[in-house]
Amino acid sequence: CGLYKSKAEKIKSTSEKICNEYNGEVPDNLGDLTKLPGVGRKTANVVLSNAFGQDAMAVDTHVFRVSNRIGIVDTQTPEKTEFALMDAIPKKRWSHSHHLLIFHGRRICKARKPECEICPITKYNRVKNRRTKCQ
């Protein structure tokens, strides 16, 4: 069932690589983190933000959906969304914004049946004088 074997193998190989190549210390930069097996930009940015307190913009399914739906960005991929959000949001607010977008996506701006009628953003958001996709 599922990808548990694959995930377990990646966790094991990542742990070995951290022990062998990084003296048991989790890397604190995007380049080294993304060299670890199974670690992409999203995971690396979450680690940088949550474990190391660095400014980072992690784009998961909620961040991607919400930021595109409400018109902060107009992108087709998580990576393009990450860079567009980094341009649109002051660096000191990246990590906090990431968490707020996730929360909003889970509670109000859901993938199916978004609750636009109670969305506090919809009525105020105007990007380049265009209405949001919810309106």
Which residues does each predicted region cover?
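Catalytic cores of DNA base-excision repair glycosylases
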Residues: C1-K133
